[in-house]
């Protein structure tokens, strides 16, 4: 059952939060990386983005927490379905968030190879429905629009989730606020800080090569 709902957009420190939650005993934690690793769930997330009813318990299975997209798209539904779950809104400087998302996530979708495997195209279709069309209405490239969506999303979460249930969290703050919120001891290890642009770009290149190879295309 889901105990922690991450409502923050991708590129707000969600991978660091995933690893931190798992270290604190709230794992496994769902993240877009989990969808890519378990692609049998792509159809269910696509259907959810199209408005079909969702069996959240079945979809999440053994996961105890969820962060990043696709889950963050459905924060309202998840907060209703799991009324005892706590909500964490990861935040980041809006300009830095946009520049990071544009140069990683959006670029990965925009600069894809002409030929890809059917499975890779299913991933892209899901991402478009959940994020680029579903959240940004196909206008992420319009910076002003994207920043407005980002601000309105963060405001809505803070308006609709009660203060005693919500943590607004910048991962730069480290363990302190997170552990206080969850009522757990601060670990002796450093707070995980991962998923910078360079690491993301290298990871994306690996995925592109894999998708092209699956299509019979020489990378």
State the predicted function of each range:
Residues 2-5, 62-65, 85-86, 163-167:
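Short active-site oxyanion
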Residues 6-8, 32, 67-71, 91-92, ...:
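Short His-Asn-centered micro-motif
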Residues 42-55, 102-119, 123, 135-136, ...:
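Ligand-binding grooves and catalytic loops that recognize ribose/phosphate and carbohydrate rings
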Residues 22, 26, 34, 49-60, 73, 77-168, ...:
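PAPS-dependent sulfotransferase catalytic domain
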Residues 34-43, 88-97, 115-117, 152-215:
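The conserved 3'-phosphoadenosine-5'-phosphosulfate
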Residues 1-61:
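PAPS-dependent sulfotransferase catalytic core
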Residues 54-77, 81-84:
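Hydrophobic/aromatic-rich structural module bridging two neighboring secondary-structure elements via a short loop
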